[in-house]
Amino acid sequence: MKSGLLFTTASLALTASAHYVFPALVQDGAATGDWKYVRDWTGSYGNGPVEDVTSLDIRCNKDASTNGNATETLPVKAGEEIGFTVRTNIGHPGPLLAYMAKAPGDASDFDGDGQVWFKIYEDGPTVTDDGLTWPSDGATNVNFTIPSSLPDGDYLLRVEHIALHGAGTEGGAQFYLSCGQVSVTGGGNGDPAPLVAFPGAYDPTDPGILINIYWPVPTNYTPPGPKVWSG
Protein backbone atom coordinates (compact mmCIF):
# COMPACT_ATOMS: atom_id res chain seq x y z
CA MET A 1 0.00 0.00 0.00
CA LYS A 2 2.75 2.39 0.93
CA SER A 3 4.63 1.96 -2.34
CA GLY A 4 1.41 2.46 -4.29
CA LEU A 5 0.70 5.70 -2.43
CA LEU A 6 4.21 6.94 -3.08
CA PHE A 7 3.85 6.16 -6.77
CA THR A 8 0.53 8.00 -6.97
CA THR A 9 1.91 11.03 -5.14
CA ALA A 10 4.98 11.15 -7.37
CA SER A 11 2.82 10.85 -10.48
CA LEU A 12 0.61 13.73 -9.39
CA ALA A 13 3.63 15.88 -8.61
CA LEU A 14 5.14 15.16 -12.01
CA THR A 15 1.88 16.06 -13.76
CA ALA A 16 1.56 19.32 -11.83
CA SER A 17 5.18 20.28 -12.46
CA ALA A 18 4.61 19.96 -16.21
CA HIS A 19 1.89 22.65 -16.10
CA TYR A 20 2.81 26.17 -17.18
CA VAL A 21 1.47 29.69 -17.63
CA PHE A 22 2.25 32.79 -19.72
CA PRO A 23 2.42 35.67 -17.19
CA ALA A 24 4.36 38.48 -18.91
CA LEU A 25 5.01 40.10 -22.27
CA VAL A 26 8.53 40.24 -23.72
CA GLN A 27 9.67 43.34 -25.64
CA ASP A 28 13.15 43.99 -27.04
CA GLY A 29 14.22 40.70 -25.49
CA ALA A 30 13.32 41.81 -21.97
CA ALA A 31 10.48 40.47 -19.85
CA THR A 32 7.98 42.93 -18.42
CA GLY A 33 6.48 42.38 -14.98
CA ASP A 34 4.19 39.44 -14.39
CA TRP A 35 0.53 40.36 -14.98
CA LYS A 36 1.44 43.98 -15.81
CA TYR A 37 0.42 43.81 -19.47
CA VAL A 38 -1.11 40.32 -19.35
CA ARG A 39 -4.53 39.74 -17.84
CA ASP A 40 -4.31 37.68 -14.69
CA TRP A 41 -6.87 34.91 -14.29
CA THR A 42 -8.44 32.99 -11.46
CA GLY A 43 -6.13 30.18 -10.38
CA SER A 44 -3.10 31.35 -12.37
CA TYR A 45 -0.86 30.48 -9.43
CA GLY A 46 -1.65 26.81 -10.10
CA ASN A 47 -0.58 26.95 -13.78
CA GLY A 48 -3.57 24.80 -14.74
CA PRO A 49 -5.02 24.40 -18.25
CA VAL A 50 -8.41 25.01 -19.85
CA GLU A 51 -9.92 21.75 -21.08
CA ASP A 52 -13.38 22.78 -22.39
CA VAL A 53 -13.13 24.54 -25.77
CA THR A 54 -16.82 25.53 -25.57
CA SER A 55 -16.38 27.53 -22.34
CA LEU A 56 -15.68 31.26 -22.07
CA ASP A 57 -12.39 30.35 -20.39
CA ILE A 58 -10.98 29.39 -23.80
CA ARG A 59 -10.86 33.08 -24.77
CA CYS A 60 -8.40 34.56 -22.26
CA ASN A 61 -8.57 32.03 -19.41
CA LYS A 62 -10.78 31.91 -16.33
CA ASP A 63 -12.44 35.27 -15.53
CA ALA A 64 -9.86 37.12 -17.65
CA SER A 65 -12.17 38.38 -20.41
CA THR A 66 -13.59 41.08 -18.17
CA ASN A 67 -10.66 42.17 -16.00
CA GLY A 68 -8.84 44.37 -18.49
CA ASN A 69 -9.10 47.42 -16.25
CA ALA A 70 -6.60 45.78 -13.90
CA THR A 71 -4.08 45.46 -16.76
CA GLU A 72 -1.87 48.04 -18.48
CA THR A 73 -1.50 48.27 -22.27
CA LEU A 74 1.97 47.98 -23.83
CA PRO A 75 2.88 50.28 -26.77
CA VAL A 76 4.26 48.23 -29.69
CA LYS A 77 5.08 48.85 -33.34
CA ALA A 78 3.75 46.96 -36.33
CA GLY A 79 6.45 44.59 -37.56
CA GLU A 80 7.95 44.31 -34.07
CA GLU A 81 8.69 41.01 -32.37
CA ILE A 82 6.70 40.52 -29.17
CA GLY A 83 6.66 37.51 -26.89
CA PHE A 84 5.48 35.96 -23.65
CA THR A 85 7.42 34.45 -20.80
CA VAL A 86 6.62 30.89 -19.75
CA ARG A 87 6.48 29.84 -16.11
CA THR A 88 8.34 27.56 -15.83
CA ASN A 89 8.63 26.09 -19.33
CA ILE A 90 6.45 24.40 -21.93
CA GLY A 91 6.36 20.90 -20.51
CA HIS A 92 4.01 19.05 -22.86
CA PRO A 93 4.05 18.26 -26.60
CA GLY A 94 1.83 20.30 -28.89
CA PRO A 95 1.48 23.35 -31.14
CA LEU A 96 2.00 26.99 -30.22
CA LEU A 97 -0.42 29.58 -31.61
CA ALA A 98 -0.98 33.34 -31.34
CA TYR A 99 -4.09 35.39 -32.11
CA MET A 100 -5.01 39.07 -32.02
CA ALA A 101 -8.33 40.92 -31.75
CA LYS A 102 -8.81 44.65 -32.39
CA ALA A 103 -10.54 46.59 -29.65
CA PRO A 104 -13.13 49.19 -30.70
CA GLY A 105 -11.53 51.55 -28.17
CA ASP A 106 -9.24 50.91 -25.23
CA ALA A 107 -7.95 47.36 -24.84
CA SER A 108 -8.73 47.55 -21.13
CA ASP A 109 -12.45 47.88 -21.92
CA PHE A 110 -12.52 45.06 -24.50
CA ASP A 111 -13.76 41.58 -23.63
CA GLY A 112 -12.87 39.99 -26.99
CA ASP A 113 -16.43 38.88 -27.71
CA GLY A 114 -17.58 37.95 -31.22
CA GLN A 115 -15.85 37.05 -34.46
CA VAL A 116 -12.91 39.37 -33.94
CA TRP A 117 -9.91 37.03 -33.56
CA PHE A 118 -7.35 36.35 -36.28
CA LYS A 119 -4.32 34.09 -36.12
CA ILE A 120 -0.85 35.62 -36.55
CA TYR A 121 1.31 32.59 -35.74
CA GLU A 122 1.31 28.84 -35.47
CA ASP A 123 3.94 26.15 -35.40
CA GLY A 124 3.79 22.45 -36.02
CA PRO A 125 5.89 19.36 -35.48
CA THR A 126 8.67 17.73 -37.40
CA VAL A 127 7.25 14.33 -38.36
CA THR A 128 9.43 11.22 -38.58
CA ASP A 129 8.80 7.50 -38.33
CA ASP A 130 9.92 7.74 -34.70
CA GLY A 131 7.34 10.36 -33.72
CA LEU A 132 6.63 14.09 -33.58
CA THR A 133 9.12 16.72 -32.42
CA TRP A 134 7.68 20.09 -31.36
CA PRO A 135 9.69 23.34 -31.74
CA SER A 136 8.25 24.91 -28.57
CA ASP A 137 9.08 21.95 -26.34
CA GLY A 138 10.87 23.19 -23.22
CA ALA A 139 10.61 26.88 -24.18
CA THR A 140 10.90 29.47 -21.41
CA ASN A 141 9.66 32.27 -23.65
CA VAL A 142 7.91 32.41 -27.01
CA ASN A 143 7.95 35.13 -29.68
CA PHE A 144 5.81 36.31 -32.59
CA THR A 145 5.93 39.19 -35.07
CA ILE A 146 3.17 41.81 -35.13
CA PRO A 147 2.11 41.92 -38.83
CA SER A 148 3.58 45.00 -40.52
CA SER A 149 0.33 46.02 -42.26
CA LEU A 150 -1.81 45.68 -39.14
CA PRO A 151 -3.94 48.82 -38.63
CA ASP A 152 -3.06 51.02 -35.66
CA GLY A 153 -5.08 50.64 -32.48
CA ASP A 154 -5.47 48.66 -29.29
CA TYR A 155 -5.50 44.86 -29.45
CA LEU A 156 -5.71 41.79 -27.31
CA LEU A 157 -2.78 39.44 -28.01
CA ARG A 158 -3.65 35.85 -27.17
CA VAL A 159 -0.98 33.16 -26.77
CA GLU A 160 -2.00 29.51 -26.67
CA HIS A 161 -0.17 26.23 -26.33
CA ILE A 162 -2.20 23.06 -26.87
CA ALA A 163 -0.86 20.09 -24.93
CA LEU A 164 -1.64 16.88 -26.80
CA HIS A 165 -0.15 14.21 -24.53
CA GLY A 166 -3.66 13.11 -23.48
CA ALA A 167 -5.53 14.15 -26.62
CA GLY A 168 -6.31 10.61 -27.76
CA THR A 169 -9.66 10.86 -25.97
CA GLU A 170 -12.21 13.66 -26.35
CA GLY A 171 -11.61 16.38 -23.78
CA GLY A 172 -8.06 15.21 -23.17
CA ALA A 173 -6.27 18.12 -24.86
CA GLN A 174 -5.10 20.88 -22.53
CA PHE A 175 -5.06 24.56 -23.47
CA TYR A 176 -2.54 26.85 -21.78
CA LEU A 177 -3.30 30.47 -22.68
CA SER A 178 -3.12 34.14 -21.71
CA CYS A 179 -4.16 37.48 -23.21
CA GLY A 180 -1.94 40.54 -23.26
CA GLN A 181 -2.97 44.11 -24.06
CA VAL A 182 -1.01 46.04 -26.71
CA SER A 183 -1.39 49.33 -28.56
CA VAL A 184 -0.07 49.17 -32.13
CA THR A 185 1.40 52.14 -34.02
CA GLY A 186 3.23 52.43 -37.34
CA GLY A 187 0.89 49.98 -39.01
CA GLY A 188 -0.87 49.92 -42.35
CA ASN A 189 -4.17 49.22 -44.04
CA GLY A 190 -4.22 45.45 -43.79
CA ASP A 191 -7.48 43.56 -43.47
CA PRO A 192 -6.95 40.68 -41.03
CA ALA A 193 -8.88 37.53 -41.92
CA PRO A 194 -10.40 35.05 -41.42
CA LEU A 195 -12.01 36.12 -38.15
CA VAL A 196 -13.20 33.65 -35.53
CA ALA A 197 -14.75 33.75 -32.06
CA PHE A 198 -13.65 32.23 -28.76
CA PRO A 199 -15.49 30.11 -27.86
CA GLY A 200 -16.52 28.94 -31.32
CA ALA A 201 -13.26 28.61 -33.22
CA TYR A 202 -12.61 25.07 -31.98
CA ASP A 203 -14.65 21.90 -31.71
CA PRO A 204 -13.66 19.12 -29.29
CA THR A 205 -13.43 16.68 -32.21
CA ASP A 206 -11.31 18.83 -34.52
CA PRO A 207 -8.47 16.64 -35.87
CA GLY A 208 -5.88 19.00 -34.41
CA ILE A 209 -7.45 18.59 -30.95
CA LEU A 210 -8.66 14.98 -30.83
CA ILE A 211 -5.58 13.01 -31.86
CA ASN A 212 -3.29 10.28 -30.57
CA ILE A 213 0.17 11.70 -31.20
CA TYR A 214 1.96 8.53 -30.10
CA TRP A 215 0.54 5.50 -31.91
CA PRO A 216 0.08 5.02 -34.74
CA VAL A 217 2.52 7.85 -35.42
CA PRO A 218 0.65 10.55 -37.38
CA THR A 219 1.94 11.25 -40.88
CA ASN A 220 0.99 14.94 -40.60
CA TYR A 221 -0.50 17.46 -38.20
CA THR A 222 -2.40 20.73 -38.73
CA PRO A 223 -3.18 22.99 -35.75
CA PRO A 224 -6.84 23.87 -35.20
CA GLY A 225 -8.39 27.22 -36.07
CA PRO A 226 -8.13 29.52 -39.07
CA LYS A 227 -5.18 30.06 -41.36
CA VAL A 228 -2.47 32.48 -40.30
CA TRP A 229 -2.83 36.09 -41.43
CA SER A 230 0.69 37.36 -41.97
CA GLY A 231 -0.17 40.89 -43.06
Swiss-Prot record:
Its cofactor is Cu(2+). Keywords: Carbohydrate metabolism, Cellulose degradation, Copper, Disulfide bond, Glycoprotein, Metal-binding, Monooxygenase, Oxidoreductase, Polysaccharide degradation, Secreted, Signal. Disulfide bonds join 60-179. Lignocellulose is the most abundant polymeric composite on Earth and is a recalcitrant but promising renewable substrate for industrial biotechnology applications. Together with cellobiose dehydrogenases (CDHs) an enzymatic system capable of oxidative cellulose cleavage is formed, which increases the efficiency of cellulases and put LPMOs at focus of biofuel research. It comes from the Eukaryota. One of its GO terms (molecular function) is metal ion binding. Its EC number is 1.14.99.56. Binds 1 copper ion per subunit. It holds the Pfam family AA9. O2 binds at residues 165, 174. Residues 1-18 form the signal peptide. Glycans are attached at residues 69, 143. Belongs to the polysaccharide monooxygenase AA9 family. This is AA9 family lytic polysaccharide monooxygenase C. The lineage of its organism: Eukaryota, Fungi, Dikarya, Ascomycota, Pezizomycotina. The gene is LPMO9C.
